[in-house]
Each structure stands twice: as C-alpha cells, then as structure tokens.
C-alpha cells in the first residue's frame, strides 16, 4: 500500500486567510441551514444586519462633519464654602457663538466685512447649559463681562476668544469657577442655518425695534416668526432703537446690552422648541442631525454619544422646563466694559459656580483647532 504523503504546512502569512475562508464556509453552511428551517428569520436577520451597517456608516459620517478643537479641560476643586451656593453641576456645556464673518449669511456687508471687524473671532454669545434630571438650565453671560486676576490683567470675555477657546475656558474657570466639561461653538452663518433647520423661531417683542448695525428690523410689536438671519440680527443687536409714541428712540449702551442678553435666552429657548418639533419625524430628525453636525464645533473629547445625550435632554424637555437665567453685569458708563458685581457672583453661585471651585488645566493652548 502506498503511504499518503503529508501535506506541507501552510505559510504563516496565508494562515489568517485560510481561517477566514473556513469561517465564511461555516457561515454559509449555517445560513443555508437556517434558510431551510427558518426562512422568515433569515430575511429578518439580513435586514437587521443591513440596518446596523447603515447606522454605523451614518454615525461615522455624522461624526466626521463636526469641527474639532483641542481643549485641555479644567478640573473641579474643593473651593470655599459660600453661603447660598448650589452644588457643582455634574455637567456644564459651554456654548460660544462667534462673530466670524468668513461665511456671514446674506453677504458679509450686512454684518461688516472681516477687514472691518479685525483679525480673529470674538465670543459674541456665551451661555452655560446645565442638563438636569427634570429639565435644562441656560445661563447667559454678558460678552462684555471683564474679569481677571488683577485690574491690569482683566479681559473681556468676548476678547478672550481671540486667543482661542482654551483662553475663554480658562478665564471662566479661574475667575468665575466654571468647570467646562464640554464646548460647542457656532459662528454667525452656522447659527442662521441651524435656526432655519429648526423651521425658524417664534418670539415675542414688547415694542417695535430696529438696529441698523445688526440688520434688525421688526416694525411691529408682538409675536414674530423669525428666519435664521433675523434671529441672528436680534441676538446681535447692540444699538437698538425702539418706537415709542410714534418716534424711534435710541437706547443706552446698558439697555442695549441687557436686551441682547435677554433675547439671546429667548431665542435659545425658541430654537430648542423648534428642534423638538422638527425631530418628531424620523426622516426630519435625520435631516436635522445632518444639519447640526455640519454647523457645530466641539472639543475633541466630546463625541456623538455626548451630543446625543444632550440632544435627548433638549428634545425631551418641555418649554416650561427650560430655565433661562440672565447673569447680571451692568456696563460701565455706556462703554463696552461690564465688571462683575456681588449680584453677578450670587447668581452664578446659586447654580454651583464659585471662584476657587475650578482649577485651569494649565498653559493656554491657543486656537487649538484639531486636524
């Protein structure tokens, strides 16, 4: 009898491929057997596999649309015991709207050209979002708030962003005790597109108002349905005129700053309401997610999971459960400077922000746009 010759061992680099081929054959055999015994179950399994694959591809695509910033997050510190201070929030989302004119809606001229505005981006809108088990708190901080470790080192929050988002995060931490856990940025054009994606916003204005510098023109008081461009003009209005007794009256710098903070909160609440309404349809919700991820910047440690968690809070919160707080800080003598007052610190402390409760991460990281 002729003795069978032993086959030569397969090369090491081919062994994984061989195992894959064996696995594929095994899967085919099992699927074929399942098809014979459970044809309906087989079809459902294939459909589910396709759906999972599509969802994963969609998640990757959505994540890739976000602009990323490298931010060194501050750390909480024990801090001093302050009477009336609330507990430090579990999460603080820092929302910054910038004044970038690079892609200004309806043409740059309406908002001033980049050359007229100067180099860099300033923080035009600054808000702190605190998700709560029973709702959401939004604290609107005046962009003119001027803070620092000494008189000669004070900076306006708006101007701190010229050195990059890290500078703003660290300044809020060291001087106000704000421990930022997540950062979201949006420029003027992005803000307008988000409002339009939400179907516009419904707001109430107490008197006719206009502002040539921001393009605001609301000739009638009462309920208003605003497009993205008009909502942007409202939250950016700094030198408004209101019509009283048939005449247009210019408001003071202090009144203009107070109205700006107020309507920032009003519009943010209205945007949340609009997003909630638009998200009721799965198809519209997907389109909305696509629009949002393409118009937001986030810190590099915030992924889609964190954004989805925030979205669930926003979309699951009724308008009555959204608390909007205007942090007080009056401007000085019709200037662009507002120093914190005892009332400023008291309001912030009520929501868990106390100087000394936050430790900055370290050296400033500059603009820090991630690749």
Language-model features: where?
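Non-catalytic, solvent-exposed segments at the cell envelope interface
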Residues: 2-371
């Amino acid at each position: 009898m002729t003795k069978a010759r032993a086959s030569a061992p397969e090369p090491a680099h081919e062994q994984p491929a061989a195992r894959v081929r064996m696995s594929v054959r095994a899967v085919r055999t099992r699927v074929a057997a399942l098809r014979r015994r459970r044809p309906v179950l087989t079809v459902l399994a294939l459909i589910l596999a396709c759906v999972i694959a599509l969802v994963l591809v969609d998640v990757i695509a959505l994540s890739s649309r976000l602009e990323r910033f490298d931010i060194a997050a501050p750390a909480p510190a024990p801090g001093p015991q302050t009477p009336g201070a609330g507990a430090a929030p579990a999460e603080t989302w820092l929302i910054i709207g910038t004044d970038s004119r690079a892609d200004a809606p309806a043409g740059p001229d309406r908002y001033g050209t980049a050359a007229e505005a100067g180099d860099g981006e300033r923080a035009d809108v600054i808000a702190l979002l605190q998700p709560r088990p029973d709702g959401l708190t939004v604290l609107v901080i005046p962009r003119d708030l001027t803070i620092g470790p000494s008189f000669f080192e004070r900076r306006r929050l708006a101007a701190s962003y010229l050195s990059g988002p890290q500078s703003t995060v660290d300044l809020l931490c060291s001087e106000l005790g704000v421990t930022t856990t997540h950062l979201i940025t949006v420029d003027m054009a992005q803000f307008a597109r988000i409002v339009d994606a939400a179907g516009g916003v419904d707001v109430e204005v107490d008197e006719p108002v206009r502002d040539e510098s921001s393009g605001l023109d609301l000739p009638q008081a009462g309920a208003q349905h605003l497009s993205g461009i008009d909502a942007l003009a409202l939250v950016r209005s700094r030198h408004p005129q209101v019509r009283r007794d048939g005449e247009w009256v210019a408001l003071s710098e202090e009144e203009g700053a107070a109205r700006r903070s107020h309507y920032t909160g009003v519009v943010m609440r209205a945007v949340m309401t609009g997003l909630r309404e638009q998200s009721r349809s799965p198809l519209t919700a997907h389109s909305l997610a696509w629009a949002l991820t393409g118009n937001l910047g986030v810190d590099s440690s915030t992924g889609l999971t964190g954004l989805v968690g925030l979205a669930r809070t926003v979309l699951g919160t009724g308008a009555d459960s959204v608390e909007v707080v205007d942090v007080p800080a009056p401007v000085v003598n019709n200037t662009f400077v507002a120093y914190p007052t005892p009332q400023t610190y008291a309001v912030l402390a009520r929501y868990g922000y106390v100087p000394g409760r936050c430790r900055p991460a370290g050296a400033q990281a500059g603009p820090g746009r991630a690749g």
